[in-house]
Amino acid sequence: MKSFEDIKLTLGKNRQYLFNKYPIQSMAVFGSYSRNEQVADSDLDILIEFNDKIGIRFIDLANEIEELVGFTVDVVSRNGIKEKYFEKIKPDLIYV
């Protein structure tokens, strides 16, 4: 199981590459990893805000992040999450 620090380091090293390849405005980790409550089978929850349409490339982005971190990732678009759910995860957001 990777630590949150390892994940932040991996995402940080690849941030510019991902932001250049995809129309990403911001990217944040939330959920168990951001609260340091992850267990061996936890996935990584990532909220991404886009500055342009991404379309089917959303799947490519999710797969690419999964390859970088080496385990299951659940990527959520900021536009795709209802405001009431965003308010629930907002305190957990750690931008990378």
Question: What name fits each language-model region?
Answer:
Residues D45-I48:
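Short beta-strand->loop micro-motif that forms the acidic, two-metal-ion catalytic signature
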Residues M1-S26, S34-A40, F50-V96:
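Catalytic core of pol beta-like nucleotidyltransferases
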Residues V29:
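Conserved histidines in hydrophobic membrane contexts and catalytic metal-binding motifs
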